[in-house]
Every structure is written in C-alpha cells, then in structure tokens.
C-alpha cells in the first residue's frame, strides 16, 4: 500500500499550496466530501482501506481532525504534514479572506466558539489554533520521522517536502495558491468539504 499523507494544518496556513505541491509530485488527492459522523474513520470499518487505497493525500477537514485514526489504521504508511504560521497572522488571514463568512467558518472549525461574545472569539480562536498544533506535535513526539512541520512563508519547502517523502526535488517552482485558497475554501456550499 502507498503512503498516506495527511495535511493537518488549519486553513490559512498553506494547505492549498501544499496540496498543489504534492500534486506536482504525482500524488493523488482525495477531493470528495466526507461526513465525519459517517463512521468512515472507524478502525472497524472494513471498507476504509479499500476506499482510501487509490489516494495518497487527504487535506483539511474532516481529515485534520482524524489524523490519529489514520495513523492507527495505516500505521507506518501514514505521514503527517502540519502547516503552520504565526497565530496572529493566521487569524488575520482567516478574517481577511472573506469577512462576511469568517465568524461562521471559525465556528465550524472550532465548535466551542459559537456561544462566545465577539470580543472573546479572537482570543479563543487563536488558543484553539495553537492547541491543535501542539496536540499534533505532541502526538508525534516519539515518531518525529512521520511528521513534517511546514511554516507558512518560509523557503526551501520543496527540499523539505521531498526529503520527508524520499523523492527528488522537481524543477517546477513551488506553487503559490493564496488567491485560489480564498476562492475555493470560502465559496464552498458544504461544511463537509471545508
């Protein structure tokens, strides 16, 4: 079975760009909606391996919330890429990407924010973002060869990704997807695709 690559960063951290880079490397990306409550991520689901077998890359929600299940099911065949950026820059990017939907999107990602007053949401969103990143890093503390942390805006991403995956660096320039991120993520109708 091929390695499974799970991108577990929050949106606004370079996930779309990283997906494009992985596609340039010939990786097949899952692009279908998934209901996280469907039981698809349950280890006892007999269809799981066959359903995911043709794909190499799984990005964003709900996959980023089920990386532990993937690691448990695919074990040594599962690699994690955590995309990160400065927390304040991340929050600003989410807000600037689409002001009319930002609150709704943050509440989808972090359900415990719904009841908060507007003044509390920024602090809570940033704390949730940092907690998510630390949880991922802590989970892989003993198997750090299975995780790559890519910081938004840093150079040498091709080399870091290719070294991590054990493939040659392509001649293509590393993609830039910021505008595509804003168009694609915030125009989705279904939260299951986000």
Where are the language model's segments positioned?
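PAPS-dependent sulfotransferase catalytic core
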Residues: 1-55, 61, 182-188
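PAPS-dependent sulfotransferase catalytic domain
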Residues: 23-27, 43-46, 51-52, 68-167
């Amino acid at each position: 079975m091929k390695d499974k690559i799970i991108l577990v960063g929050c949106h606004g951290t370079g996930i779309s760009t990283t997906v494009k880079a992985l596609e340039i490397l010939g990786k097949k990306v899952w692009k279908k909606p998934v209901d996280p409550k469907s039981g698809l991520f349950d280890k006892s689901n007999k269809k799981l391996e066959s359903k995911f077998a043709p794909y190499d890359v799984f990005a964003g929600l709900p996959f980023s919330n089920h990386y532990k299940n993937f690691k448990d099911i695919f074990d040594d065949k599962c690699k994690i890429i955590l995309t990160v950026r400065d927390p304040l820059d991340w929050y600003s990017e989410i807000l600037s990407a689409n002001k009319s939907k930002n609150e709704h999107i943050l509440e989808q990602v972090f359900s415990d924010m719904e009841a908060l007053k507007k003044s509390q949401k920024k602090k809570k969103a940033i704390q949730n973002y940092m907690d998510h990143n630390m949880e991922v890093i802590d989970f892989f503390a003993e198997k750090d060869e299975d995780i790559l942390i890519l910081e938004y805006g840093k150079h040498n991403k091709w080399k870091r990704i290719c070294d991590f995956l054990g493939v040659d660096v392509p001649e293509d320039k590393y993609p830039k997807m910021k505008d595509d991120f804003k168009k694609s993520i915030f125009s989705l109708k279904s939260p299951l695709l986000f």
